[in-house]
A protein has these predicted regions:
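C-terminal motif of bacterial Sec signal peptides marking the signal peptidase cleavage site
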Residues: 16-19
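Active-site SXXK
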Residues: 301-326, 414-418, 476-479, 483
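A short, well-structured edge-of-sheet supersecondary motif
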Residues: 250-294, 559-560, 568-570
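Structured C-terminal helix/loop/strand segments within mature extracytoplasmic catalytic/sensor domains
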Residues: 101, 107-114, 127-130, 137-251, ...
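Active-site-adjacent helix/loop patches that line small-molecule binding or acyl-intermediate pockets
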Residues: 247-272, 340-446, 471-477, 481-485
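Active-site helix/loop module of the DD-peptidase/beta-lactamase fold
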Residues: 35-58, 62, 72, 321-361, ...
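Long, solvent-exposed N-terminal ectodomains/accessory regions
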Residues: 27-180, 184-188
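Penicillin-binding protein/beta-lactamase superfamily catalytic region
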Residues: 386-392, 398-407, 420-427, 450-564, ...
Length: 595
């Protein structure tokens, strides 16, 4: 079964001005007690485990001894499509349709790893396309150690993510096993489990013990893989637990619970954090079986945050490289399918499209088009030819730049236009995502697994621009810092167009963007892929000045909010709750919004 990619935008203003939500699904299940450890016998046993283990079982103990063996080569799981157990907790679109659905099992797994001290590093990070009907993989760096009771074997574990095919949902898990360079067999079974997700429509526990093979050999570019991992880890932002806010700022009166007061269903929060005064204060990463062992490596979806974090940043990079005339380029000169559109694209600019103000829509009623069959067809289309044609089915209703209508397809179209523009400048091999990653994000030491969905379920497909980035806690905080604190500069060099960035942050005197239709008397504004809410003493008397909060928002409950005091609040959740009011208030206690 090929499942449709469902992108259903939420009430986006809630992420800026107020909290809102939907009833939580009942995900409580009665299960036997989960083991708190996995022994040598457990990992060599052929028995199917009755329940998932506690997730802390996959973590390297604080008193662990150094590894006695080195893992380098390929790890293969043997016939994963016939192994494991699943408990489905929520399945809004019947992905788990029975008859051995591919969603009930892992898909084929074959990955190379290298070891650097106690770090186990996958040779390929980022999104790995498997061809499965259900899942692709993202595999992150893990750890290697020895402990008593393992009969001379070395123990390894690592985090992995099941990313739905043509979808931005993430289902996070861990794997662990024993291995040896001198014993036979050279590897135990692999114990795996998936017990957490950021996915509003599908929730499940998936676990098992599966036979595996370990093929040792020297992995190509192993020294570079190790060096890159060392560099990325060394350049992460300073990090502390959120609880440290009360000790770092003892006189502020900060109340930790208020940071997420906009969110009623706390069990549906994956993780959140507040970057302030140079420190990334982070929550944990709770699962249904305790704390996730690799919180800093956990892959988080972005959905429509991609419109800001990728599309808008790419546009500002092009503006810095080639001048502000990029913004007024016409879509029709770069996307030939526009000439066969049901609408009128003759005068639609890059700016109009990234502002979601092309004038081509069915209805200006708030979010009506997002729920239309036409948008569903566009969102579910996987191959580029179908997707780009489905993007142009909306008729013309208004002049470009006059009416804001939330449209995934417009963001996709401008992404293709920017890609074509870049290829005209740099050659046919240029790619807009690769340029954005290499020019903007790699220099700030973004995680190696930072990646995007592409069309055709293929690494050679086109980037989307409307959805699809996969990030970590550190990634979100770093991107907030780049935009909100560093003015688009990296190591003293201006990387993003500074004028457009200030306009995007609403720190220029003029008002930019269009009001978001349906957001009330104090509307949010949308400009350059970002939402912005205006705070005044009249509307928010706790503040004595006028200021704007700019936010990136994504389906399910993804928010990255940039506050004018230089702090960034981010959260990944999946109960369709959105808000940053609580975080804004607590951040204000530490560093006032109004000088």
């Amino acid at each position: 079964m090929k499942r449709m990619r469902l992108i259903i935008p939420a009430v986006l203003l809630c992420a800026i001005l107020s909290g809102c939500g939907a009833p939580a699904a009942n995900v409580n299940q009665s299960l036997p007690v989960s083991p708190a450890s996995l022994s040598y016998n457990d990992l060599f046993s052929k028995a199917t485990p009755l329940v998932p283990a506690m997730d802390s079982t996959f973590a390297m103990p604080t008193n662990a001894s150094a590894p006695v063996d080195v893992f380098e080569g390929r790890l293969d799981l043997v016939n994963p499509s016939s192994s494991g157990s699943v408990v489905v907790l929520r399945d809004d679109y019947t992905a788990f349709y029975g008859n051995n659905s591919p969603w009930e099992h892992l898909t084929a797994f074959s990955f190379e790893f290298v070891q650097d001290g106690s770090y186990l590093i996958p040779a390929q990070q980022g999104l790995v396309y498997t061809g499965s009907e259900a899942y692709n993989y993202i595999v992150g760096p893990g750890r290697v150690w020895t402990q008593r009771g393992d009969s001379g074997y070395t123990r390894a574990s690592f985090p992995f993510t099941l990313a739905g095919r043509n979808d931005n949902c993430t289902h996070n898990g861990e794997m662990t096993f024993l291995f040896s360079n001198s014993k036979s067999p050279n590897i135990s079974n692999v114990r795996y489990q998936v017990t957490q997700e950021t996915c509003a429509w599908a929730k499940f526990n998936l676990w098992g013990n599966i036979a595996a093979t370990y093929t040792p050999y020297s992995v190509a570019n192993d020294a570079t893989i190790k060096s890159n991992n060392e560099n990325e880890v060394a350049n992460r932002l300073p990090v502390k637990p959120l609880s440290a806010l009360t000790t770092d700022y003892p006189n502020s009166g900060v109340i930790l619970a208020n940071i997420i007061s906009d969110y009623q269903e706390k069990q549906d929060i994956t993780t959140y954090g507040l970057y302030i005064n140079g420190v990334n204060y982070v929550s944990g990463c709770p699962t249904r079986f305790g704390e996730y062992s690799y919180c800093s490596e956990m892959r988080l979806p972005t959905y429509s945050v991609t419109k800001s974090m990728f599309n808008a940043v790419a546009m500002m990079r092009l503006g810095q490289l080639y001048g502000s005339e990029v913004y007024s380029q016409l879509i029709r000169n770069y996307v030939p399918q526009s000439t066969h559109s049901a609408g009128d694209w003759s005068n639609v600019t890059f700016d109009n499209a990234i502002d979601l103000a092309t004038g081509n829509y069915l209805s200006a009623t708030y979010m009506a088009d997002s729920g239309s069959p036409q948008m569903a067809a566009f969102d579910s289309a996987e191959d580029y030819s179908t997707k780009i044609n489905d993007a142009f089915v909306f008729p013309n209703q208004a002049a470009p730049g006059t009416v804001w209508v939330y449209h995934d397809n417009d963001a996709f179209i401008v992404n293709q236009a920017m890609n074509s523009y870049l290829q005209q400048q740099q050659g046919s091999g240029a790619d807009i995502f690769n340029m954005t990653r290499n020019d903007v994000y790699t220099p700030i030491h973004i995680s190696a697994g930072f990646d995007t969905l592409r069309t055709d379920n293929s690494a050679t497909g086109k980037s989307l621009g409307d959805t699809g980035l996969f990030v970590t806690q550190d990634d979100m905080a770093k991107i907030g810092k780049l935009l909100n604190n560093d003015g688009g500069k990296i190591a003293g060099s201006q990387i993003l167009d500074p004028v457009r960035l200030q306009e995007t942050l609403h720190r220029s005197p003029a008002l930019f963007g269009l009001p978001e239709i349906g957001t009330g008397a104090n509307p949010a504004y949308y400009f350059n892929g970002f939402h912005a809410g205006h705070f005044t003493p009249a509307t928010n008397p706790q503040y004595t000045c006028d200021f704007w909060v700019v936010a990136m928002n994504g389906y399910g409950g993804i928010v990255v909010a940039l506050f004018p005091n230089g702090s960034t609040f981010y959260i990944a959740s999946d109960n369709n709750e959105y808000g940053s009011i609580g975080a804004l208030g607590e951040s204000n206690k530490i560093a006032p919004m109004c000088p």
